[in-house]
């Protein structure tokens, strides 16, 4: 009986040891699999979202493409959203998860910082380009205009419609309104219902480019993007309207957001702006 008992104990012991070994192997395999998943996620490039003013819809994708190529990133690693600066700011205020905000003015980024002064924001606004204002028509020759003849054209009684971006939301619209006010024609045009207000500079250009209106105060970059003929636009002197200095701000701690911003401000990034009809920041 003693021998039988010992054999039974030995069998039970072997069975228990085998079960423990199998359990340990299973746990080890499970932990290894988890580690592989964690490492895979960690090695994936982070993705960022950029909220950009509508006037950047032509040049910014070019800059992103060049940056992605230089850094071997996929197209989807940087997501772009275009709208009026004011609309984007409202989205950010409401909690939209953007990593970088590129405004068409300096006001909104500065406002974002001032509203968080007590929390001491880690980043400060940076000026990334200066926009230019252009008087454009898809149907009428305006290339030979100058300051005097443009003022005369605007003041002359006419049924011609002129579009500007919403001055309250779009910096290009605010500068266009200021220009019209210095020429003493804004109130008259508004009263005559000849001013057609667009939501943003992108829509203003659409109105002018499709012939829905006769003229439009648009971004020089938009005119450059479509390769407009010299007869189709007149670039306003930069001293004739409030400077359109465009500021941005990094909103998150994402390393990719900081690195892309550095590229935006680099000579390579600034060359894209210059080629697109902006004034590069030196």
Placement of each model-derived feature along the sequence:
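Short linear segments in intrinsically disordered or otherwise low-structure-confidence regions
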Residues: 18-20
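Bacterial N-terminal signal peptides that target proteins for export
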Residues: 2-13
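Exported/periplasmic ABC-transporter solute-binding proteins
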Residues: 27-73, 81, 86, 93, ...
